Amino acid sequence: MIEVGEYKVKEGLYYTKDHEWAQVLEDGTVLVGITDYAQKELGDLAYVELPEVGKEVSKGDVLCEVESVKAVSEVYAPVSGEVIEVNEELSDSPEKINEDPYGAWIAKIKPKNLEEELKELMDAEKYAEYLKTL
């Protein structure tokens, strides 16, 4: 884990400038969630609007929304593909994202163009450097 001030960045994941993370699983699917920075900036999460299974997304599209006591924030797809699973636990317990932002994934995507799109994402070190500029 890399620490940047009060924020934690998990190694082995890919990151966007909008503070989503992507984890490539052994079967080639991708878990998506929001970073420690995002959950701390939002504050206590009250609701996660999960995407629909079967939804086709392009990289940068709105995947879903998360609602906190402070704001409603859009979560963007870090990769293109089809949503094949959602983390139903978050429907009843959105605070799991606050407790464990890198464990509480939001959706699993079957990617369409993974190799190309990963090149456009940041690794943990680059994301940590990016956080220092905010």
Swiss-Prot record:
Pfam families: GCV_H (PF01597). Its cofactor is (R)-lipoate. One of its GO terms (biological process) is glycine decarboxylation via glycine cleavage system. The modification N6-lipoyllysine is found at K70. The keyword Lipid metabolism does not apply. Residues 29-110 form the Lipoyl-binding domain. One of its GO terms (cellular component) is glycine cleavage complex. It comes from the Archaea. Keywords: Lipoyl. The keyword NAD does not apply. Binds 1 lipoyl cofactor covalently. Belongs to the GcvH family. The glycine cleavage system catalyzes the degradation of glycine. The H protein shuttles the methylamine group of glycine from the P protein to the T protein. The glycine cleavage system is composed of four proteins: P, T, L and H. This is Probable glycine cleavage system H protein. It comes from Pyrococcus horikoshii (strain ATCC 700860 / DSM 12428 / JCM 9974 / NBRC 100139 / OT-3).
